[in-house]
Structures are given as structure tokens and as C-alpha cells.
From Swiss-Prot:
Organism: Tropheryma whipplei (strain TW08/27)
Role, per record: Binds to the 23S rRNA.
Subunit structure: Part of the 50S ribosomal subunit.
Name of protein: Large ribosomal subunit protein uL15
MF terms (GO), sorted A to Z: rRNA binding; structural constituent of ribosome
GO biological process: translation
NCBIfam families: rplO_bact (TIGR01071)
Family: Belongs to the universal ribosomal protein uL15 family.
Length: 147
């Protein structure tokens, strides 16, 4: 049995197509190499995005204006109504509890005043609207804002 070495490896017969050698003699891909006679396409490839005499697409589209503030803080919102559905008996609700109700693992939370408070909540969130704080405090609860 012969020892197999890397330089002995060959692809299976018929699995690889032979490279077409253009411009070698007067066969099918000889002389003009299948490019026809004269013209731009016979001489050099046309660059991507070139549209002939027409204004190219990338020049007809307006440039982006303004800027994006990378320090902007995005808040996930939760309403009092949804909070009451998740915790009907009220009690202490932490920021992590609120995040699990929203269905996110990270980020900031803002409490909004949509809905009515019927039970006492001691809630901790990153931010809360003034109306939401008023509704919870009127039901003898407290709102702690982290930010």
C-alpha cells in the first residue's frame, strides 16, 4: 500500500471543469476571446454603477443629512394597565420584574399612565411620567425613579 501525501491528492475525475484559456489561437475563444469586435466592452470592463450617458443611481439619490445622536437613551415603555394585569395583587415591583413583563433582558424602562390603579404598588423604574406617578401615589403606592 502506498503512503498518501498531500501532493498526491487529486479531485475526482469530472468533478472540476477545466479553466477556459482565452486568446490562444483562432479557436472558439481565440483572437477576440468571445468579446466581439471593437467597442468599450471589447477593450475593458465597464465599472460597477456606470450607466452610460444617464446620471448614475448613486448620484441621483440625495445625500444623508443631519446626524444620529449616539448618546440617545431609548426607553421601553410599560403602562399601568399592563402592570396591573401582570401583578393584580400589587406589591413590590422591581425593575427586573418590569423587564420580564415587557420581554426584554436589558435597556431602560419608562412607566406611562395608561390605565387605572386599583391596588398599592411600590415600583422601581428608570423613568415615569408625572401622571403615572400621581396615579400610583394616589393609590397609596410609591414610585422610585433610577434616572
Amino acid at each position: 500500500m502506498r503512503l498518501i501525501k498531500l501532493h498526491h491528492l487529486r479531485p475526482a475525475p469530472g468533478s472540476r471543469r477545466a479553466r477556459i484559456r482565452v486568446g490562444r489561437g483562432e479557436g472558439s475563444k481565440g483572437k477576440t476571446a468571445g468579446r466581439g469586435t471593437k467597442g468599450t466592452k471589447a477593450r475593458a470592463p465597464v465599472r460597477p454603477g456606470f450607466a452610460g450617458g444617464q446620471i448614475p443611481l448613486h448620484m441621483s439619490i440625495p445625500k444623508l443629512k443631519g446626524f444620529k445622536n449616539h448618546k440617545k437613551v431609548e426607553y421601553s415603555v410599560i403602562s399601568i394597565k399592563r402592570l396591573c394585569e401582570a401583578y393584580p395583587s400589587g406589591g413590590v415591583v422591581t425593575r427586573d420584574n418590569v423587564m420580564s413583563v415587557i420581554g426584554k433582558k436589558r435597556g431602560f424602562v419608562k412607566l406611562l399612565s395608561d390605565g387605572e390603579v386599583t391596588v398599592k404598588f411600590d415600583i422601581t423604574v428608570d423613568k415615569a411620567s408625572a401622571a403615572a406617578v400621581e396615579k400610583i401615589t394616589s393609590a397609596a403606592g410609591t414610585v422610585t425613579q433610577a434616572r
